[in-house]
Regions:
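Glycine- and acidic
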Residues: 39-44, 71-72, 112-116, 142-147, ...
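Short, surface-exposed linear patches
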Residues: 63-68, 96-99, 120-125, 164-168
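Active-site phosphate/pyrophosphate-binding segments
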Residues: 1-99, 181-196
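Short flexible/disordered coil segments
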Residues: 22, 45, 103-111, 158, ...
């Protein structure tokens, strides 16, 4: 992370600022939704810079909670790119999906458009419109809004989601710190490799 030019101290400061009560509440909400038949969580972003962060979220939640025939399947969505393709299902499809939206309210580059609004403004308008449409359609949404994207907010999010994933594992009565499914395919691979 430091090699990429990020300030580690700010990342750790953000983690220390994490509201642990909110992280616990998020874990409880996820567990309650799971008990009601919501088996897929969409991590939805409107900022392309967050794309690999949502890939990490998929790994985090799948590995900590996807075991013993339990767990919520994490997927990632980049809006507005995915609005037309997945928006129809979210709005009117089977109610097995809930979403966690991570929206960056202010982005550093604020390019103006012919509509008198910046791209950042249009992204925020799209996020609000989708949230209202999903609310009207009965889609459950957790919305996390960040003022801006920087090392401190990323540190906050990392700790928030790591804590939530661990607590959520315990709520499901699974060990959030092992990966027996991953270990199994690795064992089979090594067996085949060593026998050739």
């Amino acid at each position: 992370i430091a090699v990429a030019g990020l300030d580690i101290d700010k990342l750790l400061l953000g983690a220390r600022k994490c509201d642990k009560d909110e992280a616990i509440k998020y874990a409880i909400i996820r567990n309650e939704l799971y008990s009601q038949g919501y088996y897929i969580e969409s991590f939805t972003i409107y900022e392309e810079k967050m794309l690999y962060f949502t890939e990490w979220l998929k790994q985090l939640f799948a590995e900590t909670q996807g075991k013993d025939n339990k767990g919520i399947l994490p997927i990632s969505v980049l809006n507005t790119r995915d609005l037309h393709s997945l928006g129809q299902y979210y709005q009117e499809g089977k109610r097995i999906i809930f979403e966690t939206v991570i929206n960056i309210v202010k982005e550093r580059k604020n390019i103006k458009t012919n509509y008198g609004k910046s791209l950042n403004d249009i992204n925020n308008i799209a996020c609000d419109a989708v949230a209202k449409a999903h609310y009207n359609g009965g889609v459950y949404s957790n919305i996390i809004e960040l003022d801006e994207l920087n090392e401190e907010t990323i540190g906050y999010l990392i700790y928030f989601f790591e804590l939530s994933a661990a607590i959520g594992g315990y709520l499901l009565h699974v060990n959030p710190f092992d990966q027996p499914g991953v270990s199994e395919y690795k064992r089979i691979m090594m067996e085949v490799i060593n026998n050739d």
